[in-house]
Regions:
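Extended amphipathic alpha-helical scaffolding segments in membrane-proximal extra-membrane regions
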Residues: 84-87, 94-256
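Short alpha-helix boundary/capping motifs
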Residues: 69-72, 188, 192-195, 211, ...
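Hydrophobic alpha-helical transmembrane segments and their immediately adjacent juxtamembrane loops
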Residues: 230-325
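Non-transmembrane, interaction-prone segments in cytosolic or luminal domains
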Residues: 49, 71-72, 137-141, 282
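Helix-boundary and N-terminal cytosolic regulatory elements
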Residues: 1-132, 203-217, 318-325
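Residue-level signal for alpha-helical context at structural boundaries
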Residues: 57-61, 171, 178, 185, ...
Length: 325
């Protein structure tokens, strides 16, 4: 699926530098779940290396940046950032990451991704720019993509936090294996998200180090770059907090399971002791010697009731002295 959009730049806020000089609009080409031939064709049309398009199919491709000039001398920036996906794509209660491939020129941005209708991409397509976020160049639009991807990570971490709380509550009251299996899924998500967010932050730093050499408007840095960095730092902090919670949850789960098993063993021990009384009584009256009540027509009933009464007395004694609590 191909999505095409022409974005008009904000002329009042436009800074004058080598990136935005006299450029009034941007063409954005967005490809979702494209086939390899489609990716190859569009890259060849702009005289770009076709291997750039191969990375979109590598689920484990990490975030990085590269600069390239084509035969016409046009500068293109090739960027990969990692976005999260979860219940929209997979059935597990966890998150994975996938690469968003960005090819940026002066008046052109091309993006490629393997998934369709991702919430953060729908926001980008609606051009829901944050307040005081001037859209002045292709670089600004790419920064907006970084912003939305950071927001997607924050949303994913928020959902993961709820899953962690749910697993914690289940671990308090269960010794079943499904709690451990749920915790395994919960463990996977923050690992993927943590790696992706840290890689994205490094790529953001590298791209800004290069383009800030061309940028003279300090207001732009305050309005755009700082907004993106704040969102990225928030995502990093939230993920680190969740990683710490999961580590504690792992320890807590081990302790809770151990305590629950101890409680089960205590109950079984009490039952065993109580059941020992009628067992011993039946053993004594089963001997082939003269025994009390052997000639009494109600002897069996008397012995049975006596055993039950004795078992109840033993139970209350154990309960009274808190022997197994």
């Amino acid at each position: 699926m191909v999505y095409q959009k022409v974005i008009q730049f904000d002329q009042e806020n436009q800074f004058q530098d080598g990136l935005a000089n006299e450029i009034k609009q941007l063409t954005w080409l967005h490809y979702e779940n494209p086939d390899k031939g489609e990716v190859r064709q569009v890259l060849e049309d702009y005289h770009l290396p076709v291997h750039f398009g191969e990375y979109v199919y590598d689920q484990f491709e990490t975030s990085w940046i590269e600069y390239y000039r084509n035969d016409a001398g046009d500068l293109f920036t090739y960027i990969i950032i990692q976005y999260p996906y979860g219940h929209e794509v997979i059935s597990e209660n966890t998150y994975h990451t996938a690469p968003l491939v960005i090819v940026m020129g002066q008046d052109l941005v091309m993006t490629f991704m393997n998934h369709t209708n991702m919430p953060f991409m729908l926001d980008i397509q609606r051009l829901n720019f944050p307040s005081d976020f001037p859209m002045t160049s292709a670089y600004a639009f790419v920064m907006y993509m970084f912003y939305e991807v950071a927001q997607a990570h924050i949303d994913a971490v928020t959902i993961m936090h709820g899953l962690i709380k749910q697993a914690e509550e289940e671990a308090r009251h269960s010794t079943k294996n499904n709690v451990s299996y749920a915790l395994i899924n919960v463990n996977k998500g923050p690992v993927y998200l943590s790696t992706a967010v840290h890689n994205n932050a490094k790529t953001l730093s590298r791209i800004n180090q290069y383009f800030n050499q061309l940028e003279n408007d300090t207001r732009y840095q305050e309005r755009v770059l700082n907004r993106v960095q704040i969102e990225m730092n928030q995502a990093v902090t939230m993920i680190e907090n969740d990683m710490a919670l999961i580590n504690k949850l792992n320890d807590m789960l081990s302790n809770v399971i151990s305590n629950n098993l101890n409680d089960v063993m205590k109950r079984l021990t009490v039952i065993t002791i109580i059941m020992t009384v009628p067992t011993i009584t039946a053993g004594l009256w089963g001997m082939n010697v003269a025994l009390p009540l052997e000639d009494n027509v109600h002897g069996f009933s008397i012995i049975l009731v006596g055993s039950i009464i004795l078992s109840v007395i033993i139970y209350f004694i154990i309960d009274r002295i808190n022997l197994f609590k």
